[in-house]
Amino acid sequence: MVTLSLTGLYAGLLGILYIGLAINIIRLRLRFKIGIGAGGNEFLAKAIRVHGNFAEYTPMALILLGCYELNGASAMMLHAMGGLLVLGRVLHVVGLNKTIGASKQRQIGMLSTFLVILVLAIENIRLFVLA
């Protein structure tokens, strides 16, 4: 039976982070009494973008990680890619919560996310060509 146990681990960790980001938006909406949009509030606008960025990049990375696992990737590579993805997403959140502008954590977080997506995309194509 084929399983996606390692992808499931990283999807679970990232799912918890995703819920945390959503709860942060709800908390800010309640505090500032804003139902839709950001209402001109920079804190809420930032929280919405942090959540949005996560929702934009994380699913593709997890799909590629799952494909890679199904294609027979080593546990070491799966942990390396999954761990780097989690680290990158956490750093991105920390960096954006630190400042709206550029920060080292934000830059490293996005570079890590891009690297994971690129490596997994190339590896999945490579495994297809070699099959």
Task: Specify the residue positions occupied by each region the protein language model found.
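A loop-to-helix transmembrane entry motif
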Residues: 14, 44-58
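Juxtamembrane boundary at the C-terminal end of a transmembrane helix
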Residues: 121-131
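Cytosolic, membrane-interface loops and tails of multi-pass inner-membrane proteins
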Residues: 23-49
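Alpha-helical transmembrane segments
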Residues: 3-20
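Interfacial loop-to-transmembrane junctions
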Residues: 91-116
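Transmembrane alpha-helical segments that form the membrane-embedded catalytic/substrate-channel core
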Residues: 15-30, 86-95
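Core segments of transmembrane alpha-helices
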Residues: 53-65, 117
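Short alpha-helical packing/oligomerization segments
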Residues: 64-87
